[in-house]
Amino acid sequence: MSLSGIITALVTPFDRDGAFDRDAWIRLLDMQLAGGVQGVVIAGSTGEAATLTDAEYDEMLCSAVVRVGGRVPVLAGTGLSGTAKTISQTKRAADNGAGYALVVTPPYIRPNQGGLKAHYLAVAEQGGLPVVLYNVPSRTGCDLLPETVADLAGHPNIVGIKEACASRERVQALLALRRPGFAVFSGDDSSAARSMLDGADGLVSVASNVLPSAYRHLCDLARAGERGAIDLWNARLSDFHAFCGLDSNPIPIKALLQRIGIGYGLRLPLLPLSVCHHDIADHLADQVAALEALSSRKIVTA
């Protein structure tokens, strides 16, 4: 199953006591599928993977694979600070039924480009899953440069990249080096339409947790080259783009989800959305149903 279009980086819903909320998880998955998403990421940074136990990781992934039932690709976040641990986590994801591993650059370690290349080649060769590279320097402290991606993209088990840098030049550099079978995804909601108009294959989105149909529509417009319609639709979503940047991800998006009845909070060291932002959260939550209803009538088959 190939990767393209809108993929949601799912949150992990917790209950009032901070435990994994399986019922809310299933409802979130169902909402994504009904909204037309073309893939889901389990236990990535948006999913607070660093706070999950092994048992929770297994339960989330297994239940998602069963619920999705092969309708869309399931990507598992498996990137950890060490290469051996990342390989082990990737094997764990494979055992739980994931179709792909989304592997972030090793956080905190700050390897050089040679180290990053060796790391990803080891995971691709030993992890047991097709690998999607994930570059998010603002979180990890290291930057996977396009020339390193060019070297890695030739490996048959490295099938794409999620690039969270919003720089147009960065995305264009990645597009210039890609080969058939290697997908380039934006990891930035606000600039994704522009990236897709330039040739990117899709978006791995945070805001689509609450607006799956709306972001599917955005991606459909971009893939169809509808520049005028994209500008209008992006304007409708601009407040959501801005809101998701008010605090560390996934604090804002989980505040919106809580307001529509999915989950109750985060795990330390993350704290709930500041009270000073509650009014805007309430305002945006009130818009969700109308935006989803409007965009669900506009989804086209890709």
UniProtKB/Swiss-Prot annotation:
Q: What are the protein's GO molecular function terms?
A: 4-hydroxy-tetrahydrodipicolinate synthase activity
Q: Which cysteines are joined by disulfide bonds?
A: none
Which residues participate directly in catalysis? Answer: 134, 162
Q: What is its EC number?
A: 4.3.3.7
Which residues of this protein are annotated with the site description Part of a proton relay during catalysis? 45, 108
The entry's cellular-component GO terms read: cytosol
Which pathway is this protein assigned to? Answer: Amino-acid biosynthesis; L-lysine biosynthesis via DAP pathway; (S)-tetrahydrodipicolinate from L-aspartate: step 3/4
Domain of life where this protein originates: Bacteria
Entry-linked InterPro entries: Aldolase_TIM (IPR013785), DapA (IPR005263), DapA-like (IPR002220), Schiff_base-form_aldolases_AS (IPR020625), Schiff_base-form_aldolases_CS (IPR020624)
Catalytic activity, as annotated: L-aspartate 4-semialdehyde + pyruvate = (2S,4S)-4-hydroxy-2,3,4,5-tetrahydrodipicolinate + H2O + H(+)
- Provide the GO biological process annotations: diaminopimelate biosynthetic process; lysine biosynthetic process via diaminopimelate
Q: Main subcellular localization, coarse class?
A: cytoplasm
> Keywords, A to Z?
Amino-acid biosynthesis, Cytoplasm, Diaminopimelate biosynthesis, Lyase, Lysine biosynthesis, Schiff base
Annotated localization: Cytoplasm
Membrane-spanning ranges: none
Matching entries from SUPFAM superfamilies are given as: Aldolase
Cross-referenced Pfam families, in alphabetical order? DHDPS (PF00701)
Residue positions binding pyruvate: 46, 204
Q: Which family does it belong to?
A: Belongs to the DapA family.
Instruction: Relate the assembly described in the record.
Output: Homotetramer; dimer of dimers.
Q: What NCBIfam families does the record point to?
A: dapA
Function, as annotated: Catalyzes the condensation of (S)-aspartate-beta-semialdehyde [(S)-ASA] and pyruvate to 4-hydroxy-tetrahydrodipicolinate (HTPA).
Q: What is this protein called?
A: 4-hydroxy-tetrahydrodipicolinate synthase
Q: Which organism is it from?
A: Xylella fastidiosa (strain Temecula1 / ATCC 700964)
